[in-house]
Each structure stands twice: as C-alpha cells, then as structure tokens.
Regions:
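Active-site-proximal specificity loops/subdomain of glycosyltransferases
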Residues: 39-128
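Short, acidic, metal-binding catalytic loop of nucleotide-sugar glycosyltransferases
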Residues: 20-33
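Short aromatic/hydrophobic "clamp" motif used to bind/position activated sugar donors
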Residues: 132, 138
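Short acidic, S/G/P-rich loop/turn micro-motifs used as interaction or catalytic elements
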Residues: 11-15, 45, 140-142
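Catalytic core and acceptor-binding pocket of nucleotide-sugar-dependent glycosyltransferases
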Residues: 100-127, 140-144, 162-233
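Short alpha-helix within the catalytic core of nucleotide-sugar-dependent glycosyltransferases
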Residues: 18-22, 119, 142-153
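Local beta-strand N-terminus motif with an aromatic residue
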Residues: 1-3, 33-34, 128-129
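N-proximal low-complexity "stem/linker" segments adjacent to membrane-targeting elements
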Residues: 1-19
Length: 233
C-alpha cells in the first residue's frame, strides 16, 4: 500500500507543525510506504522577511527551511521556485468572501506542480499510488487521522464543514485514489474554464466547484479536527 503525500505553496510554520504531522498522520500509517512530492515557493533573498507583511502570524522565510524539508520529508521529488505574479486582470474575487486572485492562482499552480511530480514518478515507474494526500505545511491536527486504508479511497475525503457555499470544500487537506486526486487537483490547468462555468472566485469555492460540479467526483466529508498552526490555542 503506497501513499503519495503532496506539500505545496509557502512553507508556513513548517518546522513547528511537522512533529504534529508525524504523530497524527505519519505514525498511524507507518506500515505503508509514504513518498513526499513537493513544490515550494522559496527565494533566498526573502530570508528573514514575513511570508505576508500584513499577517505576521503566518511566519517568516527562514534560511534552513530547504534543508529541513529534504531531511525530514526525504522527498521522492521536490521543486523550489521563486514566487511569481500571475496575470488575471479580468478575474474578480467574490466580494462575499474575497481572497487575492494572485494568491488563489499561485496556490493552485503550486498544488498542480506537486501533483505533476507525482504523476511523472508514477509514469516513470509504471504504477499508481493507492492514495494521494494533499496537505498544507502549517496544518495542526487536533486528533489523529488514523490509518488511511480504513477510509473509502474511491471518494475524495475532506473535512465536514460549511465552506462558504453548498459546493465549497475546505482546501487544506484531502485524500483519495490517485486517479480521483488527479481530477481534484487540476484546478490551475482549468482555472479559466472553472471561472467561466460560474465558480465563485475563492479557493474553497473553486476547488469544491471543480470537484463536485465540473468533475462530479464522489466526496466524503469526515469529522476530523484540525486548525492552522496560527489558529491553535
């Protein structure tokens, strides 16, 4: 039983949250092979600065983050890229739950790049992972997820919560079969189509729209308990 774990985006609270990931996710699944694939935004010249000046509780760029990732994740493949701006002048955030459009596109680009590394590894080795997991570096699980193979992997497993609209899905953590997750995570490549189909321009609305309306994927909502590191009490 093989699991692909995808990390992406800014390495927020990576070092603080990793012991929690180890205890609540890696340990309950340590009898399985867990391979990490990651696409991370990283720019040496930003070391010491906050990820987002407006929100200092989201952490800083640190000099040893790259080394930490390679040592602790032992990734099958990892790609570091300097943050970049995405052109999207005609895409407007939904005013009910606004989120900077560049951040939205950047998030889904990074997720797509991590998943592309996974797909390339599958193609090169002529197999499919039994399960693919998308996880933020700054997630803090308040109770263990448990053994992954006890879940229905012919469905996208997500958090049971209301995420803005009926089709909205919490965008921090999800898993399912490799084939289903390839569709769940293909937002960046199809961003314009998804927007033109009527998705609200907000991360949780877009990923949920892509899964439940565009692809009509089976989705299972689970009573997990987790928060972002910055929100933990």
């Amino acid at each position: 039983f093989k699991i692909a774990l995808l990390y992406s985006g800014q390495p927020r609270h990576l070092k603080e949250a990793f012991p929690n990931h180890h205890d609540t996710f890696w340990k309950p699944n340590d009898s399985y092979q867990i391979d990490v694939f990651a696409h991370m935004w990283y720019d040496e010249k930003w070391i010491g600065n906050y990820f987002w000046d407006q929100y200092k509780d989201r952490g800083r760029w640190e000099a040893d983050l790259k080394e930490f990732m390679i040592e602790n994740w032992n990734p099958k493949a990892i790609l570091f890229e300097e943050p970049k701006e995405f052109e999207a002048e005609d895409i407007i955030p939904d005013p009910r739950f606004p989120h900077p459009v560049n951040n939205i596109i950047s998030q889904f680009y990074s997720i797509s790049q991590a998943n592309a590394l996974k797909k390339q590894y599958e193609d090169d080795n002529n197999f499919k992972y039994d399960c693919v997991v998308r996880l933020r570096t700054d997630e803090y699980f308040q109770r263990p997820i448990g053994p992954i193979n006890e879940y229905n992997l012919d469905s996208i497993n997500v958090l049971k919560e209301w995420a803005h609209v009926e089709h909205g899905i919490n965008d921090h953590f999800a898993f399912g079969s490799s084939e289903l997750m390839d569709k769940y995570l293909d937002v960046y490549e199809n961003f314009v189509e998804i927007a033109e189909m009527g998705a609200e321009i907000n991360p949780e609305c877009i990923i949920g729209f892509n899964a439940q309306i565009r692809h009509k994927l089976p989705v299972t909502k689970n009573d997990w308990k987790y928060v972002l590191w910055r929100d933990k009490k």
